[in-house]
Amino acid sequence: MTTTAEQAPAAAPQAFSKAPGTGVALVTGASSGIGEDTAHKLRALGYIVYGAARRTDRLQALTADGIRPLAMDVTDDASMSSGVNRILEETGRIDVLVNNAGYGSYGAIEDVPIDEARRQFEVNVFGLARLTQLIIPHMRTRGSGTIINISSIGGRL
């Protein structure tokens, strides 16, 4: 099943309640699906939006909507630090973080190669945690911020 930003829970707009044009958002996994839709929705609400993904060639289409493409690999600390620093240098703030980058390796546990399982945890768990660690201090300093973590049924054991 595919879900779009329009199908998000009704409470979600409250998280994006800043006045138009006053917020800065970072959306990971913005090259397709929920991440891409979320980036467009935030932009329509007036946010300055940075759409992050490993494959920046797929992000170029977002620029027509005013979304700023950002090369970021959530398994690479230097890549995440560089991306966060760029946003802070250009705007001075990050008001919303949408952790949407994800990777799925499916199958019975005995059939999934352990390297694939590790990669999935690196992207879906440790990447999310590290990017959140990089951004929380800036949100704390400002006294506000919103972090949204997107997951999947794949996280259910």
Predicted regions located by residue number:
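Conserved glycine-rich cofactor-binding loop
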Residues: 31-32
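The beta1-alpha1 cofactor-binding region of Rossmann-like NAD(H)/NADP(H)-dependent oxidoreductases
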Residues: 72-82, 114-115
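A hydrophobic alpha-helix adjacent to the NAD(P)-binding/active-site core of NAD(P)-dependent oxidoreductases
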Residues: 69, 112, 120-121
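A short, exposed helix-loop element centered on a Lys and neighboring polar residues
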Residues: 132-133
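Residue(s) in the substrate-gating loop at a strand-loop-helix junction
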Residues: 152
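A glycine-rich helix->loop->beta "capping" turn
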Residues: 86-99, 105
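Substrate-binding pocket helix/loop in short-chain dehydrogenase/reductase
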Residues: 108-109, 116-118
